[in-house]
Design a protein with these regions (language model features):
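An amphipathic alpha-helix signature
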Residues: 28, 59, 63, 96-108, ...
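Helix-turn-helix
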Residues: 1-25, 29
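Hydrophobic alpha-helical connector segments
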Residues: 29, 43-71, 126, 149
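Amphipathic alpha-helical packing segments from all-alpha helical-bundle domains
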Residues: 39, 85-113, 120-124
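Amphipathic alpha-helical segments used for helix-helix packing
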Residues: 60, 66-93, 135, 139
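Residues in soluble alpha-helical coiled-coils and helical-bundle/repeat scaffolds
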Residues: 21-25, 29, 70, 138-142
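Short, basic, alpha-helical segments at the C-terminal edge of helix-turn-helix-like DNA-binding modules
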Residues: 32-39
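Hydrophobic alpha-helical segments that form the core
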Residues: 64-66, 116-139, 146-157
Length: 162
């Protein structure tokens, strides 16, 4: 309830309503904050990757993805198990969209400048890949990183660059 939220953060209900109209608005703000943290980690990955070393970049982003799905990560199975499936789906949708937007505006453009673009509908392809990999790793946490890497490379038509 809103009273529970206000009590947990140490504010009055009236102060809560000063900033937020309802619980959905709070949830949206929290989701945006968590997604911004994920984007910051991607920006760090992007800044430190070796230009032109696509194989290493894929290895590193697979490790990053796995860390985001770990038990305490933002994409963990625990969020669903805690009864927040609808919120989790909202989160996945928004996160995949923003991550795709970030990658298509940065890493993908750099790749295109050097190699051309082996895929069309970049944003939609990345969105589908992100949602799919999150689900795959969450459902099969023991899946080998090489398989995850191969799925990403095949989806993005990167095999000839590895």
């Amino acid at each position: 309830t809103i009273s529970d939220i206000a009590e947990r953060v140490g504010m009055t209900r009236s102060l809560f309503y000063h900033y937020f109209q309802d619980k959905d608005q709070v949830a949206g703000a929290v989701l945006d904050d968590v997604i911004s943290e994920v984007i910051a980690r991607l920006e760090e990955w992007n800044e430190h990757r070796e230009a032109g070393n696509i194989s290493k970049a894929l290895d590193d982003v697979v490790r990053l993805t796995r860390s985001l799905i770990a038990d305490e990560g933002p994409f963990s199975q625990r969020l669903i198990e805690d009864g927040n499936a609808a919120l989790y789906l909202r989160f996945i949708d928004r996160a995949a969209d923003r991550i795709s937007e970030y990658l298509c505006g940065s890493t993908v453009r750099e790749f295109e400048e050097k190699h051309g673009m082996p895929i069309r509908n970049e944003h939609e392809t990345f969105y589908t890949l992100i949602v799919g990999l999150i689900s795959l790793i969450r459902l099969h946490p023991d899946i080998d990183d090489d398989i995850v890497r191969q799925v990403a490379a095949q989806t993005l038509h990167l095999d000839e660059y590895l």
